[in-house]
Structures are given as C-alpha cells and as structure tokens.
A protein has these predicted regions:
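Extracytosolic ligand-binding ectodomains
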Residues: 1-114
Length: 114
C-alpha cells in the first residue's frame, strides 16, 4: 500500500491499494499512508466479505457466529487486499499468496519498487 502507484496495472492489489491511499490520505493528509494503517484497512476488506457469510451461521456474539466466521475465512477463497492477496484455508492461517510479493528498495529516503 505504501507503493500503490508504483505497482504495475496488472498487480492484483493495485486497485485496492489505491483505494486505501485515497481514503486514508483524504482523511489524514498527503503522504500520511503507512503499512500499519493498511493492515487495518485490509481487515475491513476481509470482514466485509466474511461477515455476510458468517451471519448465515448465527447472530454476532454467539458460538455459532464465531464458528461461521472461522469457516468463512477458511473457505471464502481469494481476497485482494492493499498489501497482497489472501487465501486462507483450514491448514493455512497465514493466507498470503506468493503471487503479489514485490521487492522494495529505499532510494533517497523513499520506497521504490525494484
């Protein structure tokens, strides 16, 4: 997300990363973006996808909802977020796929995609 504009147009995260940058910097000012706020943004992207699925299992706050949320996360498939693509499974709770990694280099104090 900190290098959103530098990502190639074909990068799966570019659209979401640019949305994060636009929303965040509109609120906090140009140049204020950071990877930590992007993690929070990405969490909301994931929840917007998972919660409607989990609600079919039960009401929020119940054991059924929590189980439904876990099941949704493990089965909802590929989710593009500002810092990569997530695809959790029952056996993989890290979830980040290898397809979206980029190498960054600091040049004159700024991050640059290599």
């Amino acid at each position: 997300a900190v290098v959103a504009e530098q990502l190639p147009d074909s990068h799966p995260s570019k659209k979401v990363a640019l949305a994060y940058v636009q929303q965040y910097e509109k609120t906090y000012g140009a140049g204020s973006r950071n990877q930590f706020a992007a993690h929070g943004f990405d969490s909301l992207v994931v929840l917007e996808k998972a919660v409607p699925i989990a609600l079919k299992s039960g009401k929020p706050g119940t054991k059924e909802f929590r189980a439904g949320l876990r099941a949704a996360l493990e089965t909802m498939g590929r989710t593009e977020v500002s810092q990569g693509v997530l695809n959790w499974t029952k056996d993989d709770h890290w979830g980040y796929t290898m397809e979206t990694g980029v190498m960054l280099k600091v040049v004159n104090g700024d991050w640059k995609v290599e």
